[in-house]
């Protein structure tokens, strides 16, 4: 009698099963206590590990926008690509404190700037629930929610001479709005894009066409950056050139 039950291993490729057994050396980083370590950040560099070297060189000497900075794990990795500065946006009170601690204990203050703002389509206010890597905006359940201020990427960098080399977004379902608020920056600088598209189904279908409509010659790939999860940590990677 045929069984229709699946093993967990059936949902992963052979390569992913091998990666699951790998030990990630974090000894060169100082990690604050009380945070969840997201292995894909260090293993696949938020998706940068899938890009050719000639594309990665475009980050050197330019600005990185880290949307959804969490405790600064992405910033630790991004420094390997020698940006001029990393702006780490993290609006959650407790997480922002961890971000500042990471910057301090790793002596990254000359390169990494913590920004206690959320990112969105336009400036405004919102309420957010949660204190870890899965905090999310709420429009109805305000109990125990934190009010946060929001800016757009276009507004934040308006009037500045900064050239953006990379935009990374993992903002718990607000990615589409953030991209809509960054279109002028994308048109101007054509940065590498690392956009999480697994929080909301519509993001998987709408974000790429929105960027395609700009006619900037972007190439795209979709990669699952985590070898440990079936669907989460799916990232739309875009680059020009």
Features from the language model and the residues they span:
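Phosphate/nucleotide-binding beta-alpha loop and adjacent structural elements of enzyme active sites
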Residues: 1-241
């Amino acid at each position: 009698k045929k069984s229709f039950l699946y093993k967990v291993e059936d949902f992963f490729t052979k390569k992913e099963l091998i990666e699951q057994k790998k030990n990630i050396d974090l000894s060169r980083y100082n990690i604050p206590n009380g945070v969840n370590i997201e292995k894909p950040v260090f293993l696949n560099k938020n998706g940068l590990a899938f890009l050719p070297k000639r594309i990665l060189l475009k980050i050197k000497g330019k600005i990185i926008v880290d949307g959804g900075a969490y405790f600064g794990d992405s910033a630790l990795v991004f420094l390997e690509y020698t940006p001029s500065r990393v702006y780490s946006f993290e609006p959650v009170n407790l997480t922002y404190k961890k971000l500042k601690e990471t910057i301090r204990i790793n002596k990254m203050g000359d390169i990494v700037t913590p920004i206690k703002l959320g990112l969105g389509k336009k400036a405004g206010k919102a309420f957010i629930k949660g204190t870890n890597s899965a905090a999310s905006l709420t429009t109805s359940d305000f109990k125990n929610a934190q009010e946060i201020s929001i800016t757009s990427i276009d507004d934040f960098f308006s009037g500045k001479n900064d050239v953006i080399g990379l935009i990374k977004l993992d903002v718990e379902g607000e990615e589409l709005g953030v991209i809509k608020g960054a279109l002028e920056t994308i048109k101007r600088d054509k940065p590498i894009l690392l956009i999480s598209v697994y929080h909301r189904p519509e993001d998987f279908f709408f974000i790429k066409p929105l960027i395609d409509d700009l006619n900037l010659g972007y190439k795209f790939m979709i990669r699952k950056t985590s070898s440990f999860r079936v669907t989460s940590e799916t990232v739309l990677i875009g680059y020009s050139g």
